[in-house]
Amino acid sequence: VTDPAEGFVHLDDREVHSGRIWSVVVGQFTSPGGVITRDIVRSPGSVGVLPVLFDPEGVPSVVLVEQYRPALDRAVIEIPAGMRDVPGEDPAATAARELTEEVGMVASRLEHLTTFSPSPGMTDATTMVFLALDCTNTQRAAQGPEEEAMITHHLPLADALGLVESGAIHDAKTVIALLM
């Protein structure tokens, strides 16, 4: 088996846009067929956190949010999440912060479930997914108009999995978190 990356060398990036969080670069690479360029979105990455609660009988439920997503121009049901936009902040601390901001919860235990690349054909972004356990309620600290307008859903895990199966939940980080 040959290495599909063999013969590719990243030569240079030229920034063509710098936004509040992301930048867009034109990357130049050598390839087995010659020099190529690719548009790449550079991102600090993100976190998602799945709060799991248990009733007295041990039946699990999850806490999801529904918020407007401007890129899709509609509301999306998803796990609490956010960008890793605080330089030097530990990803688990980012997950804990997002849990408080979006659903007003504090987790006694945060466990890293997985890290994935949501769209490796266009961005270097990675998303780290955490499981939040032993959660208690605290004051919600919404940041921005989307979070202020978001709705919180407490659902039995089985119902959330049904929403994945039906396609009502289609956000990648949420599907991954619920199926893990």
Identify the residue ranges that each predicted region occupies.
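Conserved hydrophobic "DFG−1" position in protein kinase catalytic cores
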Residues: 29, 51, 64, 131-132, ...
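Nudix hydrolase/Nudix homology domain
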Residues: 2-8, 75, 112, 120-123, ...
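Internal catalytic-core helix/loop-beta-alpha segment
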Residues: 86-114
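Conserved Nudix-box catalytic region and its N-terminal flanking loop in Nudix hydrolases
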Residues: 41-43, 50, 58-97, 139, ...
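Conserved beta-strand segments that form the floor/walls of ligand-binding pockets within enzyme
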Residues: 63-64, 78, 98-100, 111-112, ...
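Acidic, metal-coordinating catalytic segment for phosphate/diphosphate chemistry
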Residues: 12-50
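Active-site-adjacent beta-strand/loop module that shapes the phosphate/pyrophosphate-binding cleft
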Residues: 23-34, 119-139
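Acidic pyrophosphate-coordinating catalytic loop
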Residues: 15-20, 70, 116-127
